[in-house]
């Protein structure tokens, strides 16, 4: 702000000149004092110039309504919503989220810098604040087979972009606590910036070493006990409520029962599909659910606003006070977080608006390259004694490493609706690598499901109760260049194409939402438990940095012991 602008805004703040916009008689939520005050809010040049009694050239009477800061999503992968970034931003704005701190490591894992450039371009100039954390682990771990590599040297030019805040979630905690050279380079590059974490089950001295490296946040806490350990180590816990990982209830109950201060807690969605956003809400849902669990409304709103702004050093966001950007949400109900209207930089966000999607290169639409596999390729030899298998977890993306005697014929695993077969196939560089493993608890019968959304390398994953359906699902994803597909009784039941890097649809959010709802319904009809989101659960089954057991293109991997159970060279 230059001297001339400051002088002009000061006159409005003092009431000597009318403000451009005044929101009258609002019940203003003050996140500093945690109180509600009936006040006018005056806006000039996109900033809040005063909270008190004001006159404006335009006035809006908000008697009986609440006015609070715009909500902030502390950590999300826009790609995980399945729609183009402008579509998602517009949809989430309707639920009061005005600031998005994104980690585009999905697109960077597929397409390297071209993927990052796509995301920066797609989020430029929108009616929201979109900040970027540069992906730290591409690939997630050294043995992963992905499409891009993002080194410290490649990151450095992006630091000049004012929307780049810091380093994205550091998943390779082994490299952090081992002080490995490439990781140390990245940590040094971001020494003056915030660094996001990803530290499931790190404890004691390992967690201390991780925090010592300057890693500030974590969104992988699934219970209160672990969240408390991270708080004790000076970290900010980003309470996640997404489509597959729903951690909020366990943590918020712990906060309430132990009367823990909420200053080191924020909210995030991480990975949330567009249909769940449209049905439940975005960060508004985190707030609403927390209030329903007994958290005081003003504390929940503060966690969604000021706490996050302070954590990420966003000094003009997160509060309704002079000098803050005029991003706010008008609520009809505090407990229900019922959004009446949303403002960004003092302008009311349009509900009905044509969304302009910038085109992407043809190269980003041709990223699925699968080998031609046969039923013979999918055979998995198993002993008569118990074998390692992946057991799915209800309502979480973690898995359990269990051992069981598997159904077999002629020494080979025969899948069924209880013991499914999962296949991961490399899709980026045509290596032909793939791996097969048994899965317990997914319970899919009469067919198969496949996806090219498979964190974080985004190879193609298929699961089913028979080889023929699995092979047909793989062929269908090759045909449409990525997406979700379902096979039932040897026929393609439904497909949601995601042709942009195998991650993002080029259709509107309503079409994606409709197809996704249909496909999730089909999956549950075919036996997938209601507590498991079929596509989210499948998309994380190949991520080797989340406990306990995973499958990669190199074989079955023990994520706790950090070693392969079965390695395929």
Swiss-Prot record:
Keywords for the protein's UniProt record, in alphabetical order: Hydrolase, Manganese
Domain of life according to the entry: Bacteria
Reactions the enzyme catalyzes: adenine + H2O + H(+) = hypoxanthine + NH4(+)
One MF annotation (Gene Ontology) recorded for this entry: adenine deaminase activity
Gene3D superfamilies: Metal-dependent hydrolases (3.20.20.140), Urease, subunit C, domain 1 (2.30.40.10)
Record EC number: 3.5.4.2
CDD domains, sorted: AdeC
Enzyme class (EC, first level): hydrolase
Listed cofactors: Mn(2+)
Pfam families: Adenine_deam_C (PF13382), Amidohydro_1 (PF01979)
InterPro entries linked to this entry: Adenine_deam, Adenine_deam_C, Amidohydro-rel, Metal-dep_hydrolase_composite, Metal_Hydrolase
GO biological process: adenine catabolic process
Family the entry assigns: Belongs to the metallo-dependent hydrolases superfamily. Adenine deaminase family.
Official protein name in the record: Adenine deaminase
Species of the source: Desulfitobacterium hafniense (strain Y51)
Lineage per the UniProt record: Bacteria, Bacillati, Bacillota, Clostridia, Eubacteriales
């Amino acid at each position: 702000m230059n001297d001339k602008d400051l002088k002009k805004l000061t006159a409005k703040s003092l009431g000597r000149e009318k403000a451009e916009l005044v929101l009258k008689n609002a019940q203003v939520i003050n996140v500093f004092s945690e109180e509600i005050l009936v006040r006018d809010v005056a806006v000039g040049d996109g900033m809040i110039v005063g909270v008190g009694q004001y006159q404006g050239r335009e006035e809006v009477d908000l008697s009986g309504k609440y006015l609070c800061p715009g909500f902030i999503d502390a950590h999300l992968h826009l790609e995980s919503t399945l729609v183009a970034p402008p579509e998602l931003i517009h949809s989430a704005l309707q639920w009061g989220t005005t600031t998005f701190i994104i980690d585009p490591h999905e697109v960077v894992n597929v397409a390297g810098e071209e993927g990052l450039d796509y995301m920066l371009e797609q989020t430029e100039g929108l009616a929201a604040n979109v900040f970027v954390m540069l992906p730290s682990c591409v690939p997630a771990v050294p043995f992963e087979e992905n499409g891009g590599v993002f080194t410290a040297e490649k990151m450095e030019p992006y630091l000049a972009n004012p929307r780049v805040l810091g380093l994205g979630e550091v998943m390779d905690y082994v490299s952090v606590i081992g002080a490995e050279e490439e990781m140390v380079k990245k940590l040094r590059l971001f020494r003056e910036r915030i660094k996001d974490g990803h530290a499931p089950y790190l404890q004691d001295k390992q967690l201390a070493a991780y925090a010592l490296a300057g890693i500030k946040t974590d969104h992988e806490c699934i219970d209160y006990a672990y969240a408390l350990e991270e708080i004790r180590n000076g970290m900010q816990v980003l309470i996640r409520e997404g489509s597959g990982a729903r951690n909020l209830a366990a943590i918020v109950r712990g906060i309430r029962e132990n009367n823990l201060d909420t200053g080191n807690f924020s909210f995030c969605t991480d990975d949330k599909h567009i249909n769940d956003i449209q049905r439940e809400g975005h960060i508004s849902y985190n707030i609403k659910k927390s209030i329903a669990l007994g958290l005081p409304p003003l504390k929940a709103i503060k966690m969604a606003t000021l706490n996050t702004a302070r954590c990420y050093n966003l000094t003009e966001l997160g509060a309704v006070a002079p000098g803050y950007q005029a991003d706010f949400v008008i609520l009809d109900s505090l407990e229900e977080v019922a959004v009446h209207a949303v403002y960004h930089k003092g302008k009311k966000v349009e509900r009905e608006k044509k969304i302009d999607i910038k085109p992407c290169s043809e190269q980003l639409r041709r990223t699925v390259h699968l080998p031609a596999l046969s039923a013979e390729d999918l055979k998995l030899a198993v002993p008569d004694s118990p074998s390692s298998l992946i057991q799915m977890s209800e309502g979480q993306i973690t898995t359990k490493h269990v051992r069981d005697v598997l159904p077999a014929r002629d020494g080979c695993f025969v899948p069924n609706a209880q013991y499914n077969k999962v296949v991961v196939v490399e899709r980026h560089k045509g290596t032909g690598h793939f791996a097969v493993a048994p899965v317990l608890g997914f319970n899919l019968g009469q067919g198969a499901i496949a996806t090219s959304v498979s964190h974080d390398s985004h190879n193609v994953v298929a699961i089913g109760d028979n080889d023929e359906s699995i092979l047909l699902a793989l062929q269908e994803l090759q045909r449409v260049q990525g997406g979700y597909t379902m096979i039932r009784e040897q026929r393609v039941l439904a497909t949601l194409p995601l042709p942009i890097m195998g991650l993002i649809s080029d259709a509107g959010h309503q079409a994606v939402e409709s197809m996704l709802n249909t496909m999730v319904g089909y999956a549950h009809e075919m036996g997938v438990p209601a507590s498991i989101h079929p596509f989210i659960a499948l998309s994380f089954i190949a991520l080797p940095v989340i406990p306990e057991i995973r499958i990669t293109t190199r074989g079955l991997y023990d994520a706790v012991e950090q070693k392969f159970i079965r390695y395929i060279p």
